[in-house]
């Protein structure tokens, strides 16, 4: 059978072939829509700007009763194992088979639940203004968009229906590559982002956080080439599993900033789609009133492909009245932009008409009823599900697929019409990030108990044993070798990216997120976040990591072995003796073994004495020192030479960029870890074999980076250099794999030491008590 032959899509029965009760359930599933409708007396009007942000929030009993009754039912889920509950609700989800069917049958790009949800919205409401079709140009802005499924869905809709307009888009999300961003706040999937980076705006600080006024100003400049924005979407949220009952309040500031951004950027007559959750709180009531006053039509819609048991809804706003109509109010709203806006209510309670509150309550009751019924039914079926119920669910799921395809008339789209026709990146971080959040496999109650434990209790109970004890010796030359060939580095296309100084390194595209998170917790809880090794650790010499340390002899032996391998594959043997440049390792210079290398030392005592902290290799002082040593080293090297270079870690884009440069000018790079028994100091070295020369333009570019680093440090600037090699380059497969291996070895070695130290202190403490 030919590998190119496509798997046939399963032919499904038409909806008419299902029983009336199945059809009735599916009709209801696709009919969760509430339209506000405005009173004829036109009493829904915005208040005078002088009245906004003057009063405290006033919660209303009718809405609080709805919130409390919903949370009572949600609390019944607290003792359920999340993996078991998710597996159960995946089966009871009537729309659960739609996504995979759509992906196969119409060749949908980035076909996720969000893709299908947005397609339902596109096909249910006239989101795209007629003006866009008349002028032949559509501009859209997508806020909090990761991973990009709304964009992919819109592309499919436009291309498959052959709408006569040229489409331009700009997107924003929390930058998955920014080291100070918390992965709990992000969707760690960069399949689309990595291949379309030029269309993503991460703001002046490069974080992607929309909740700052500087971001809003920068975004307006970024989209200034668009004559008008016809459509804005905002799909923002973050992980609320630590406090699911307060999801609405936790995301209220984000919703406010999304709304203000949309009202500031959207053109007259445009459309806005906003993801919200429950709308019981006063802050949500205010936002809904604002939107009803700013748009001709407001609908609240729950797509069939949105899981029926959650609170998610989409507010669909049509025919924007324009910035001019609300200019005085909008100007004042931007002054309260940010995370602290919820301290005062947007509107005083008395300015919101009773007719709006009544209509809004009807909306909340409408969706509250459906959610309550779904959760209660899922609990009942979780405890006992018979064969008849399983068969009915299977029929419902099959009927939902057919109804979806028939109702929305989805069409096949060839890959030539995708946003990313062929990925230019061999391996984005997406494949590595999936499946790493093992906290999902605990019940809510278990997670809360774990959060309540002190750091020492967690160590004593062995919660981190797997990270510490799986840390074995990394043998260089066996698996982690980065092979390079002389290549033309297009550094004229690169640019230096500055941003706000990193307070700490919370995430990295070059490391397993769980390992980094655990290491940071260990440093923060055990060592106070940052420390001085001279004062804190030298008096406690009994604390040393028990794992094997590579001796100087083994390091040189490995280096010689790699050098010989390289010489064996070379046609022309270098006429001069190969030089080995040691950076910062004065002890290696006096090694008593015969090696066929001319050993030279580039002294840099500071480079090896940097210690592990919450900043890791994000410290600008360390980065400047490392780059300075690298530039001095490159001046000393000739073709075929080798180098031993100590490295603290490579979590940041800056350090990954330097490893990429090394990768391009050496035939082989591998690493050795650990090389030191000193606690939490630099414990890894790079073995760089077969120097191939660095082009002068690249060397000069690195010099300019170094000069900027020095300028920023000497002026005590709040900025630092975040990146100087494009992410598209850093995400290439071989380099990414190497960095993951290197960082895992370093992080686990530090974890091993910290946890071993804590265990010894716990044991000593218990012995003293006895």
From Swiss-Prot:
GO biological process entries: 7-methylguanosine mRNA capping; methylation
- Substitution effect: residue 307 to A: Strongly reduces mRNA cap binding and catalytic activity of the enzyme
Q: Which keywords annotate this record?
A: Cytoplasm, Methyltransferase, mRNA capping, mRNA processing, Nucleus, S-adenosyl-L-methionine, Transferase
Primary location class: nucleus
State the reactions this protein catalyses. a 5'-end (N(7)-methyl 5'-triphosphoguanosine)-(2'-O-methyl-ribonucleoside)-(ribonucleotide) in mRNA + S-adenosyl-L-methionine = a 5'-end (N(7)-methyl 5'-triphosphoguanosine)-(2'-O-methyl-ribonucleoside)-(2'-O-methyl-ribonucleotide) in mRNA + S-adenosyl-L-homocysteine + H(+)
Membrane-spanning residues where? none
GO molecular function terms noted in the UniProt entry: mRNA (nucleoside-2'-O-)-methyltransferase activity
Q: Which residues form the Adrift-type SAM-dependent 2'-O-MTase domain?
A: 109-322
Consequence the record notes for mutating residue 142 to A: Strongly reduces mRNA cap binding and catalytic activity of the enzyme
**Record-linked Pfam families:** FtsJ (PF01728)
**Leader sequence residues:** none
Enzyme class (EC, first level): transferase
What SUPFAM superfamilies is this protein classified in?
Answer: S-adenosyl-L-methionine-dependent methyltransferases
Q: Indicate yes or no for the key word Aminoacyl-tRNA synthetase.
A: no
What compartments host this protein?
Nucleus; Cytoplasm
Functionally, this protein is described as follows: S-adenosyl-L-methionine-dependent methyltransferase that mediates mRNA cap2 2'-O-ribose methylation to the 5'-cap structure of mRNAs. Methylates the ribose of the second nucleotide of a m(7)GpppG-capped mRNA and small nuclear RNA (snRNA) (cap0) to produce m(7)GpppRmpNm (cap2). Recognizes a guanosine cap on RNA independently of its N(7) methylation status. Display cap2 methylation on both cap0 and cap1. Displays a preference for cap1 RNAs.
Report what the protein is called: Cap-specific mRNA (nucleoside-2'-O-)-methyltransferase 2
Please tell me the species this chain comes from.
Homo sapiens
């Amino acid at each position: 059978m030919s590998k190119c032959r496509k798997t046939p899509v399963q032919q499904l029965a038409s909806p008419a072939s299902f029983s009336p009760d199945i059809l009735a359930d599916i009709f209801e599933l696709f009919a969760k829509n509430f339209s506000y409708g405005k009173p004829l007396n036109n009493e829904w009007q915005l208040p005078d700007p002088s009245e906004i942000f003057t009063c405290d929030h006033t919660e209303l009993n009718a809405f609080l009763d709805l919130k409390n009754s919903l949370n009572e039912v949600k609390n019944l889920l607290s003792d359920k194992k999340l993996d078991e509950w998710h597996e159960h609700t995946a089966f009871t989800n009537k729309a659960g088979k739609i996504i995979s069917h759509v992906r196969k049958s119409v060749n949908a790009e980035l076909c996720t639940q969000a893709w299908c949800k947005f397609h339902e919205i596109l096909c249910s409401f006239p989101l795209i203004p007629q003006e866009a079709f008349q002028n032949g140009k559509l501009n859209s802005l997508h806020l909090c968009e990761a991973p990009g499924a709304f964009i992919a869905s819109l592309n499919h809709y436009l291309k498959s229906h052959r709408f006569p307009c040229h489409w331009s888009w700009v997107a924003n999300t929390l930058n998955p590559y920014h080291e100070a961003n918390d992965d709990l706040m992000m969707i760690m999937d960069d399949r689309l982002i990595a291949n379309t980076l030029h269309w993503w705006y991460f703001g002046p600080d490069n974080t992607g956080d929309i909740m700052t006024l500087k971001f809003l100003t920068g975004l307006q400049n970024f989209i200034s080439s668009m004559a008008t924005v016809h459509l804005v979407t905002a799909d923002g949220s973050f992980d609320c599993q630590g406090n699911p009952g307060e999801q609405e309040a936790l995301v209220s500031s984000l919703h406010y900033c999304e709304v203000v951004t949309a009202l500031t950027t959207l053109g007259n007559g445009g459309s806005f789609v906003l993801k919200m959750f429950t709308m019981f709180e006063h802050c949500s009531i205010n936002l809904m009133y604002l939107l009803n006053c700013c748009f001709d039509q407001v609908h609240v819609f729950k797509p069939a492909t949105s899981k029926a048991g959650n609170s998610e809804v989409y507010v669909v706003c049509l025919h924007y009245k324009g910035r001019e109509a609300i200019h005085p109010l909008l100007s004042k709203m931007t002054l309260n932009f940010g995370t602290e806006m919820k301290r005062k209510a947007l509107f005083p309670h008395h300015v919101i008409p009773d007719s709006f509150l009544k209509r809004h309550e009807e909306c909340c009751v409408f969706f509250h009823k459906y959610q309550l019924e779904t959760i209660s039914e899922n609990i009942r079926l979780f405890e006992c599900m018979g064969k008849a119920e399983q068969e009915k669910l299977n029929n419902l799921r099959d009927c939902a697929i057919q109804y979806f395809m028939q109702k929305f008339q989805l069409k096949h789209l060839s890959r030539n019409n995708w946003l990313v026709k062929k990925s230019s990146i061999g391996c984005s971080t997406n494949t590595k990030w999936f499946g790493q959040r093992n906290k999902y496999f605990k019940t809510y109650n278990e997670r809360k108990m774990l959060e309540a434990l002190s750091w020492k209790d967690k160590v004593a109970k062995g919660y981190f044993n797997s990270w510490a004890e799986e840390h074995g010796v990394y043998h260089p030359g066996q698996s982690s070798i980065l092979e390079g060939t002389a290549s033309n580095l297009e550094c004229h296309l690169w640019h230096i990216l500055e941003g706000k100084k990193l307070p700490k390194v919370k995430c990295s595209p070059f490391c397993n997120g769980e390992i980094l998170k655990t290491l940071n917790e260990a440093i923060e809880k055990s060592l106070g976040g940052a420390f001085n090794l001279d004062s804190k650790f030298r008096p406690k010499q009994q604390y040393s990591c028990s794992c094997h340390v590579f001796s100087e002899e083994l390091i040189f032996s490995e280096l010689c072995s790699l050098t010989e391998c390289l010489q064996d594959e070379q046609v022309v043997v270098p006429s001069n003796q190969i030089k080995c440049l040691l950076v910062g390792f004065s002890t290696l210079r006096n090694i008593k073994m015969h090696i066929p290398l001319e050993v030279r030392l580039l002294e840099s005592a500071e480079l090896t004495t940097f210690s592990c902290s919450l900043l890791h290799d994000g410290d600008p002082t360390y980065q400047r020192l490392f780059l300075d040593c690298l530039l001095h080293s490159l001046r000393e090297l000739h073709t075929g030479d080798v180098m031993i270079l100590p490295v603290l870690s490579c979590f940041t884009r800056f350090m990954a960029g330097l490893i990429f440069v090394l990768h391009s000018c050496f035939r082989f790079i591998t690493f050795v870890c650990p090389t030191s028994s000193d606690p939490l100091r630099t414990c890894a070295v790079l073995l760089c074999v077969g120097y191939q020369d660095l082009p002068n333009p690249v060397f000069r570019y690195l010099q300019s980076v170094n000069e900027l680093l020095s300028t920023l440090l000497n002026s005590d600037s709040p900025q630092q250099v975040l990146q100087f090699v494009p992410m598209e380059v850093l995400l290439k497969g071989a380099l990414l794999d190497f960095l993951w291996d290197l960082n895992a070895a370093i992080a686990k070695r530090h974890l091993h030491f910290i946890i071993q130290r804590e265990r010894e202190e716990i044991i000593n403490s218990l012995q003293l008590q006895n």
